[in-house]
Swiss-Prot record:
Root EC class: lyase
Taxonomic lineage: Bacteria, Bacillati, Cyanobacteriota, Cyanophyceae, Synechococcales
UniProt-listed CDD domains: MECDP_synthase
Quaternary assembly: Homotrimer.
Source domain of life: Bacteria
Record family assignment: Belongs to the IspF family.
InterPro entries tied to this protein: MECDP_synthase (IPR003526), MECDP_synthase_CS (IPR020555), MECDP_synthase_sf (IPR036571)
Record protein name field: 2-C-methyl-D-erythritol 2,4-cyclodiphosphate synthase
Binding residue positions for a divalent metal cation: 15, 17, 51
PANTHER family reported in the protein's UniProt record: 2-C-METHYL-D-ERYTHRITOL 2,4-CYCLODIPHOSPHATE SYNTHASE, CHLOROPLASTIC
Co-factor: note: Binds 1 divalent metal cation per subunit.
Length: 166
């Protein structure tokens, strides 16, 4: 039996950040207002949606995770715009001969209500990946007041990416 590289690859990503005062709340590149004035804590802009998508893209090609490329110990990534980091991850994927078929993600947060911002998130992510907005799925759900997301201690995101050999 001969070995061949499949023409499709799938990757999973996950990220979570703590909600804290005096930080911006950025999701999918959009600056949002939390009713309690909270934002996500992190070395970069802490955009859990974009971080989960980056990890899914990297995972599809067994390239590690975003911490390998943008370590929080490196001062150059302090306050970094995650959409700019996403462009770098996509360039890495393309340099290895792969293209993005689609990405799909689910945000888990009690507040703020995310539905009014979903289309803007999808468009911003699609632009940075270089795909049409209908190739970027973003959904939001609550955790029914269970766990850290339910207690509004943080926001998390799960993502999946499908890649195709170019």
């Amino acid at each position: 039996m001969t070995s061949s590289v499949p023409s499709l690859r799938i990757g999973n990503g996950y990220d979570v950040h703590r909600l804290v005062p005096d930080r911006p709340l950025i999701l999918g590149g959009q600056l949002l207002e939390h009713p309690a004035g909270l934002g996500l804590d992190g070395h970069s802009d802490a955009d859990v949606l974009v971080h989960a998508i980056m990890d899914a893209l990297l995972g599809a090609l067994s390239l590690g995770d975003i911490g390998k490329y943008f370590p929080p110990s490196d001062p150059q990534w302090k306050g970094a715009d995650s959409l700019v980091l996403l462009e770098q991850v996509v360039a890495l994927v393309k340099a290895r001969g792969w293209g993005v078929v689609n990405v799909d993600a689910v945000l888990i947060a009690e507040r703020p209500k995310l539905k009014p911002h979903i289309e803007a998130m999808r468009s911003a992510i699609a632009l940075r990946i270089g795909v049409a907005p209908d190739q970027v799925g973003v959904k939001a759900t609550t955790n029914e007041q269970l766990g850290p997301e339910g207690r509004e201690e943080g926001i998390s995101c799960q993502a999946v990416a499908l890649l195709q050999a170019l």
